[in-house]
């Protein structure tokens, strides 16, 4: 699911939803769900400060469902309220909804920062947003480019190529 909670940058959600579906298929996650929330620089800066203790906005944040309580889960994702808080960070089996879908977590993206990166990298905003979605999904799966000695970067490069994002 793609949610747009910002108004600064015009974004077509449907192509991003189709891309997200394609990423999930490519990674064998067709029975998994996640939420991508497009938000303002101010909102993502608040989350960045609260959860990473870093000042200022960032391009993408990921909140894996199994590892931590997501600030987005109670408001927007299929897991709401007490059920989300109760199941977060217990190290148990992934919560399966009645449909058999595993909820992976939430990704927050700043389209304003994505637009700046798109200009810098000389590519369309839509491509930059897709790159950030892919990056966020890999974080939801447990990859961490800051600690995994290049494993996430290698996988991301390979997937970018397969998904036409090079």
Tell where the protein language model's regions lie, with residue ranges:
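An acidic/histidine-cluster motif and surrounding catalytic segment
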Residues: 1-130, 138-166
């Amino acid at each position: 699911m793609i949610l747009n909670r910002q108004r600064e940058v015009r974004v077509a959600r449907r192509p991003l939803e189709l891309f997200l579906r394609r990423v999930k298929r490519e990674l064998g996650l067709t029975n998994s769900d996640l939420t991508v929330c497009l938000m303002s620089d101010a909102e993502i800066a608040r989350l960045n400060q609260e959860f990473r203790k870093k000042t200022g906005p960032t391009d993408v944040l990921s909140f894996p469902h199994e590892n931590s309580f997501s600030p987005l889960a109670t408001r927007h994702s299929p897991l709401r309220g007490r059920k989300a808080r109760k199941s977060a960070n217990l190290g148990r089996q992934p919560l399966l909804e009645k449909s058999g879908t595993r909820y992976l977590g939430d990704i927050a993206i700043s389209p304003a920062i994505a637009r700046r990166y798109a200009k810098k990298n000389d590519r369309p905003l839509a491509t930059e947003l897709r790159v950030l979605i892919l990056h966020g999904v890999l974080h939801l799966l447990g990859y961490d480019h800051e600690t995994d000695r290049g494993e996430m970067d290698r996988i991301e490069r390979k997937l970018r190529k397969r998904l036409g994002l090079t």
